[in-house]
Amino acid sequence: MDTYLVRSAWSGKVLDVPGGSLDNGALVQQFQYNGGTNQHWEFTPVSMGFYKIESESSQKVLDVPGGSLDNGVQIQQFMDNGGTNQHWQLLSAGNGSFYIASESSQKVLDVPGFATGDGVIIQQFQFNGGRNQQWQLIHVADDAQTYKVISVSSGKVLDVPAGQLGDGVQIQQFTDNGGTNQKWEFIPVGNGFYKIASEASEKVLDVPGGSLDNGVQIQQFTDNGGTNQHWQLLPAGNGAFYIMSEASQKVLDVPGFAAGDGVIIQQFQFNGGPNQQWRLVPVG
């Protein structure tokens, strides 16, 4: 199962079960991220593009009370019973965020009145395209894990050329050869972000100087804790992820959909293309 923070694109707060309640009927709120399991949600496919969304702490699922069709109904957690009022669809907002729509009501999760405070109860409301209805799904893991990172467009993997150890070496795509220079450790740094370290060099993926510009080429660099070395994983909805810089809000991108070995990876504004999507395949 995949576990995520569900963060409002409007308020920056995350879905939260108040106090980690285990009760049926506990209302779900937005709250500042604090790392608790009551803010972690497991998305489990149930059918035809729908998911149940289960709290890691309570093992209860997001639920529209009584399957109501009304605007303004507050969302609760409840024991999984297989009802369509507990099934949710992820609809792309086109910016890396999603609308989360109930199968039963066709309403979406909504932060009432564009509120930004802690403790605001989440409601369902008819779709209107507002940012208070958009949610970022940020992959979370408790422990570091090692992956090869495969471009959806080219099938090539992220690679440190010849396993070089120096700072400033630019990261390329290359045919998978199983080398440690193609293995990447995703190490949680908090708030759903990771540093991404080469197994070969022990350097991390880095946006040079924290640049905000499109087309800046990605390098490896000694870990210094900067936000230009922190990355979040945003699901593309097909088992792949967009890998977004905390500093620039740009994503890893294969320039021009290039398919060849040796192409240097850049950052670019999100556009949803397969050249910005990456599959993470665990390696030993």
Predicted stretch roles:
Residues 33-38, 81-85, 126-133, 177-181, ...:
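Extracellular interaction modules
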Residues 72, 215, 262:
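A short beta-strand-loop micro-motif that forms or neighbors metal/cofactor-
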Residues 122, 263-267:
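Low-complexity, intrinsically disordered Gly/Pro/Thr-rich segments
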Residues 29-30, 232:
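A detector of tandem-repeat and repeat-rich interaction/domain scaffolds
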Residues 1-22, 40-69, 85-116, 134-165, ...:
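Extracellular glycan-recognition/adhesion modules and their associated mucin-like linkers
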